[in-house]
Amino acid sequence: MVVTINIRNININYIQYGSGSDVVLLHGWGQNIAMMKPIGDRLQKNHRITILDFPGFGKSEEPKTALTVYDYCEILEELLKKLKVKKPVIMGHSFGGRIAIIYASRNEVEKVVLFGSPCIRKEVKPSLKLRMLKSLKKIPGINKLEGFAKNHMGSRDYKNASEVMKKILVNVVNEDLSECAKKINVPTLLIWGDRDTEAPVEDAKELEKIIPDAGLIVLPNSTHYAYLENLPQVINILNNFL
């Protein structure tokens, strides 16, 4: 059953079910509880599952100010404290993985699982979109189209968001969490799709080097949602890891 709790004057939706040791599941940007429930449903026999809609997503209220990823982590910390969740296994997909990294860097956790979680900001290696824009600039008389191209090639996440959520998205993607990742001192499992364009496998390999006790599993022919595309296999992996 979905429950609403007020944290920092924001009504936040969450569900908690199952029994056993605690597992916390954190969804990605633009997603909600439903995106992590397939994992929770298959782990609930041996674990107490907690999943929330982050502020601004699902049925949780939108924040009135532009939060940072650290603000989101503080909200998670308050929620888990109220729910008496201690030393959980924390799992996050994409944006949720960013929050999991911060949480695990400064709280007691049993283990960490990250699914396609970009957390290392790179100045070099511009994205395909930026490369395309730069190539456009080389064509005479094309400069006027740059704004048009940026608008039409911009992130769907960004274009669909409210003004507050747009500012939050900018805050999130500009944050480099390398230093937080280095502080994670528990076994950490990275599960990635080899065709992930949002968080390329190269990023996962770097993350594996940064986190002291990390292991990487790359799933073939899989995208940013590799954990859902290979659910039976991922559940087997998780059961062995936990």
Residue map of PLM features:
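Conserved alpha/beta-hydrolase catalytic His-Asp/Glu region
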Residues: 123-186
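Flexible "cap/lid" loop of the alpha/beta hydrolase fold
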Residues: 98-140
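Active-site loop/oxyanion-hole signature of alpha/beta-hydrolase fold enzymes
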Residues: 51-89, 236
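Catalytic histidine-centered segment of alpha/beta-hydrolase-like enzymes
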Residues: 222-231
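Conserved alpha/beta-hydrolase "acid-adjacent" motif
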Residues: 197-203
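Short beta-strand/loop motif that positions the catalytic acidic residue
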Residues: 184, 190-192, 196
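Alpha/beta-hydrolase fold catalytic core
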Residues: 1-23, 44-47, 86, 110, ...
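Conserved HGGG/HGGXW glycine-rich cap/lid loop of the alpha/beta-hydrolase fold
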Residues: 10, 15-59
